[in-house]
Amino acid sequence: IRCFITPDVTSQACPDGQNICYTKTWCDNFCGMRGKRVDLGCAATCPTVKPGVDIKCCSTDNCNPFPTRERS
């Protein structure tokens, strides 16, 4: 499977055994100005996250593009 990987947001082949792409988003101190922080990558299973962190997992090539920021 191929997933987008941060920080470069390039499509890369995942290591053997990692067949899930994820998009993790959360707010830091600059959320109001910059929007949510985004982490993209590969995983063997969908990661569990802390409260306040959103995660989306998928299992097709390049299914985790960088999310577009919602304009307020």
UniProtKB/Swiss-Prot annotation:
Expressed by the venom gland. One of its GO terms (cellular component) is extracellular region. Signal peptide: none annotated. GO terms for molecular function: acetylcholine receptor inhibitor activity; ion channel regulator activity; toxin activity. Pfam families: Toxin_cobra-type (PF21947). The keyword Aminoacyl-tRNA synthetase does not apply. Keywords: Acetylcholine receptor inhibiting toxin, Disulfide bond, Ion channel impairing toxin, Neurotoxin, Postsynaptic neurotoxin, Secreted, Toxin. Disulfide bonds join 3-21, 14-42, 27-31, 46-57, 58-63. It is found in: Secreted. Binds with high affinity to muscular (alpha-1/CHRNA1) and neuronal (alpha-7/CHRNA7) nicotinic acetylcholine receptor (nAChR) and inhibits acetylcholine from binding to the receptor, thereby impairing neuromuscular and neuronal transmission. Belongs to the three-finger toxin family. Long-chain subfamily. Type II alpha-neurotoxin sub-subfamily. This is Long neurotoxin 1. It comes from Naja anchietae. The lineage of its organism: Eukaryota, Metazoa, Chordata, Craniata, Vertebrata.
